[in-house]
């Protein structure tokens, strides 16, 4: 054993925001609703990359179409404590002023009822102005099959969406759905600061294990830029060292000019 154990590297919470632009909603809202339902309900909502908050224009096609894809029986979560946490988290969100249930339903309260039945998928909705005013009450991850739609005014110059996005903390992923030609640079620049993986026209739950994958994000998503998926995940156990003016013989072989390792 070592007197200097490896430091903890872990994932804390991640909302994995999704932004749907007015153009994307108008041209593909019904399809996006079906895909969102599949994404946030996958594995009973227990993926760390679950889309937990989705920004949609007011009066969106997506919101109207989503309820028909949400439902079914209760799903068993990994542990009783996770089930209880889901129940408590959903009820706390639903009780927040300005938040409403738009798909699914809340189970009867009480630990016995929820532990017995499991977790039922739920979709909540709230206006972007409420999120900007009360981010701590709404922008908190609930582990399980729930997502929150945030409605923004599409004709207000993007100010409402921008303020709501500014209230977000770091996530593993951020996703953008936009129609060709829509001006999305301000939104994209904000999403880049929020997440370690930025997706276009997709959903974040799938995580391919390959060299190109990056599974980490700004605090509070992870404690390290690299975590548990992809070939570069080993870097979470590494510490960078720079050598300045070192003679060749004192350098690790991988850094020597004569390249003895033929890298």
Give the ranges of each region predicted by the language model.
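NAD(P)-dependent aldehyde/semialdehyde dehydrogenase
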Residues: 8, 56-172
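Long, acidic and serine/threonine-rich low-complexity regions
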Residues: 17-20
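Short, small-residue-biased leader/transition segments that mark boundaries at the very start
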Residues: 3-10
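Extended hydrophobic packing segments that form well-structured cores
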Residues: 251-263
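Flexible, glycine/charged-enriched surface loops at secondary-structure junctions
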Residues: 44-47, 51, 75-84, 100-105, ...
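C-terminal core of ALDH-fold dehydrogenases
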Residues: 112-119, 157-251
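Active-site PLP-lysine loop of aminotransferase-like
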Residues: 11-12, 34-54, 70-75
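Short, solvent-exposed loop/turn segments at the edges of secondary structure
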Residues: 12-15, 35, 47-50, 118, ...
